[in-house]
């Protein structure tokens, strides 16, 4: 008997989700860290503020690092998928959780990959150990897809799995809303 592939599992997860066009409440897991988010602006990281970010129906927590060859190979696909999403309520959001060894390494990686989404500030990573503990998987790159309540829907195990997670999210975003 064949094992079900990740794409099939993803389809089932998304089919079983009861999601409104936009979540009614901010993401329960990320909201406590909202004040610690930064985003690339020009050549530096600046504080990030967006209530809409916290209301996405899906949030991908992306664990990665610039020193990781698999992360550098995978990141362009995530950037492309993120940038090609249609505007609207079904957008997924991404939160970068750096596994780099320094703030400079994190900034260099974000700049080189042109990541437009927020990241947890490097000096605040120790205050977010629960995110790392519950969502980081067993290696990087790791994509953990969570719903607004913080329920882990999917988690990649490798850069190949990460690509399948991305493909499923893009397919979900393209589906017309059923009312």
Residue ranges and their predicted role:
Residues 125-166:
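Thiol/disulfide oxidoreductase modules built on the thioredoxin-like
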Residues 1-8:
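Bacterial N-terminal signal peptides that target proteins for export
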Residues 9-17:
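Bacterial N-terminal signal peptides
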Residues 101-139:
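Thioredoxin-like thiol-disulfide oxidoreductase module
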Residues 36-58:
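A short beta-strand-turn-helix
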Residues 16-40:
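N-proximal helix/coil linker or "cap" segments that precede and/or mark the start of modular domains
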Residues 57, 64-67, 139:
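Short pre-active-site segment immediately N-terminal to redox-active cysteine/selenocysteine motifs
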């Amino acid at each position: 008997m064949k094992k079900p592939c990740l794409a099939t599992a993803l389809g089932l997860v998304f089919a079983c989700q009861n999601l409104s066009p936009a979540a009614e409440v901010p993401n329960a897991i990320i909201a406590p860290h909202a004040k610690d988010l930064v985003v690339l602006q020009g050549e530096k990281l600046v504080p990030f503020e967006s209530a809409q970010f916290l209301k996405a129906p899906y949030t991908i927590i992306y664990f990665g690092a610039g020193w990781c060859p698999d992360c550098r190979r995978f990141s362009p696909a995530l950037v492309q998928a993120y940038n090609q999403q249609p505007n609207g309520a079904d957008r997924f959001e991404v939160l970068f959780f750096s596994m780099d060894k320094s703030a400079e390494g994190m900034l260099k990686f974000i700049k080189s990959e042109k990541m437009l989404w927020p990241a947890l500030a490097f000096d605040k990573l120790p205050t977010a150990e629960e995110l790392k503990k519950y969502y980081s998987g067993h290696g990087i790159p790791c994509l953990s897809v969570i719903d607004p309540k913080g329920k882990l829907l999917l988690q990649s195990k490798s850069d190949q799995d990460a690509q399948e997670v991305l493909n499923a999210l893009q397919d979900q975003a393209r589906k017309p809303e059923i009312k």
